[in-house]
Design a protein with these regions (language model features):
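A short hydrophobic/aromatic micro-motif that marks alpha-helical segments and, especially, helix-coil
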Residues: 37, 138-139, 196-197
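Short, charge-rich amphipathic segments
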Residues: 3-13, 52-61, 79-96, 121, ...
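Solvent-exposed, flexible loop/coil residues
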Residues: 3-6, 13-17, 142, 150, ...
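Active-site segments that bind and position negatively charged phosphate/pyrophosphate groups
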Residues: 65-170, 176, 180
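C-terminal charged capping/lid subdomain of soluble metabolic enzymes
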Residues: 41-46, 50, 54, 60-61, ...
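A glycine/threonine-rich phosphate-anchoring loop and its flanking beta-alpha core
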Residues: 1-74
Length: 232
C-alpha cells in the first residue's frame, strides 16, 4: 500500500522468498512498538464487517467481491490475538508468534490471495482522516486500534471485546496518547464520512453513517472506563 494524494492504493506485485524474524530483537523493543502490531490484525474484525456491509448494500467493488472463506480465515486471526492477550503483553515467544501469524495473513496481503479488502475499513479510514486533518504522524496501531473501536461501535458488533483486548495488552488508543485533543478527534470523526466519500475509499459503514455528539460521548466514556479500570 502506498499513498497517492493522501489516498492509500495498492500497487506492485512481489512474492518474498524468505522472511527472517529475530525473536530476541523483537522482545527487546519498546513494548508499545510491538503492541502496535495488533492494530493491523484486529482491523480484520472491522474490515470484514465493512466488507459484508458493502456486499449487503450492493456497493462492493467488482475487483474485491466478498469471499466468506477469506473472511472466516481473517476472523480466526483476530481470535489468535484475543486468546493471547497475556502472551502479547509480555512479548514471549507465543505472543510474537501470534503477531507474526496474523500479520503475515493481512499486512503482507500476498498471503490472502492478493486481496486486501479484509485488511482495512473504518479502522484505517479514521487513521487516514486524522492524518489528513492534523498533519501528524502516528504510531500506526494507535489510530487504527481506535478505528477498530469506532467501526465496531458503528456496526454494533464486538466493541467491548475489542477494547478490552487492546487495553489489556497495553496499547493506549486514547487521543491524548497520540498527541491529540478530544476536540481534534471529534472533528476527525465528524469529517470521516465526507472524507472517505471524497477520496473514494472502498465502501464501508463510515461512508453512510453520520457520527453524532452522543456517539462521541459514548466513545469517550468507553475509553476512559477501559483505561481507568486497567490502572486501578
Amino acid at each position: 500500500g502506498i499513498r497517492i494524494d493522501s489516498k492509500v492504493v495498492y500497487r506492485g506485485w512481489a512474492i518474498p522468498q524468505s522472511i527472517y524474524i529475530d525473536y530476541d530483537v523483537l522482545a527487546s523493543c519498546h513494548p508499545a512498538l510491538n503492541w502496535s502490531g495488533i492494530g493491523d490484525i484486529l482491523c480484520f474484525h472491522t474490515g470484514v464487517l465493512d466488507w459484508r456491509y458493502a456486499e449487503r448494500e450492493g456497493k462492493i467493488e467488482e475487483k474485491w467481491r466478498y469471499d466468506e472463506g477469506l473472511a472466516q480465515q481473517s476472523l480466526r486471526k483476530v481470535r489468535g490475538i484475543v486468546e493471547n492477550i497475556d502472551n502479547i503483553r509480555v512479548m514471549n515467544d507465543q505472543g510474537i508468534e501470534a503477531l507474526v501469524d496474523g500479520l503475515k495473513w493481512g499486512t503482507s496481503y500476498h498471503g490472502a490471495g492478493w486481496c486486501p479488502r479484509h485488511i482495512e475499513g473504518t479502522d484505517h479510514f479514521l487513521f487516514y482522516t486524522l492524518e489528513k486533518l492534523t498533519g501528524k504522524k502516528f504510531l500506526h496501531g494507535q489510530p487504527v486500534g481506535l478505528g477498530v473501536i469506532v467501526g465496531s461501535m458503528l456496526h454494533e458488533d464486538g466493541a467491548e471485546e475489542m477494547l478490552d483486548t487492546i487495553s489489556s495488552i497495553g496499547l493506549d488508543i486514547r487521543p491524548e496518547a497520540m498527541g491529540l485533543t478530544w476536540d481534534q478527534l471529534a472533528e476527525g470523526l465528524k469529517l470521516l464520512r465526507s472524507y472517505v466519500n471524497k477520496v473514494g475509499l472502498w465502501h464501508s459503514i463510515a461512508h453512510d453513517v453520520k457520527i453524532s455528539d452522543g456517539f462521541i460521548t459514548d466513545l469517550q466514556n468507553r475509553l476512559n472506563h477501559a483505561y481507568h479500570h486497567k490502572k486501578s
